[in-house]
Design a protein with these regions (language model features):
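Bacterial N-terminal signal peptides that target proteins for export
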Residues: 1-6
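Transition segment at domain starts
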Residues: 23, 29-31
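Bacterial signal peptide processing site
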Residues: 18-20
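C-terminal motif of bacterial Sec signal peptides marking the signal peptidase cleavage site
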Residues: 13-16
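C-terminal partner/receptor-binding element of secreted or periplasmic proteins
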Residues: 107-124
Length: 124
């Protein structure tokens, strides 16, 4: 009887563990806004200007996305980190906008367009 109990417990334990490399499953769905976190400042893509930005409007690369949270984070208590973005892939460059202070606005390419991200202040 003891060997059967041990086998049963081992099977139960194995079923409860996740295999390395297996996709994670979330019980919580987060509805992300289109943001990028640079340092302690969160920038959000709000309504875009009537005239879309062009390549010539972009200044120097200011930062790069380090981590895409959408599809990878399901903890509603997750604390944003420098380089996090909702929908931009890791490695995406974040640009300064010519004539705009970086503390107010930045830009990035998303879904075939150049979007303006407006500073919302330090993240909590």
């Amino acid at each position: 009887m003891a060997p059967k109990l041990m086998v049963g417990l081992a099977l139960l334990l194995a079923a409860a563990c996740q295999a390395p490399g297996a996709p994670t499953t979330c019980n919580t769905q987060i509805d992300w806004v289109n943001f990028v976190q640079v340092g302690s400042t969160q920038y959000v893509a709000k309504q875009q200007p009537p005239t879309p930005l062009q390549q010539s409007d972009l200044g120097a690369v200011y930062a790069h996305v380090k981590f895409k949270v959408s599809g990878n984070v399901c903890d509603p208590n997750y604390r944003l980190k420098d380089g996090d973005a909702a929908f931009l892939d890791a490695g995406t460059p974040i640009y300064q906008i010519n004539g705009q202070p970086a503390i107010e606005q930045l830009a990035a390419r998303f879904d075939g367009r150049i979007l303006v991200y407006t500073a919302m202040g330090p993240a909590s």
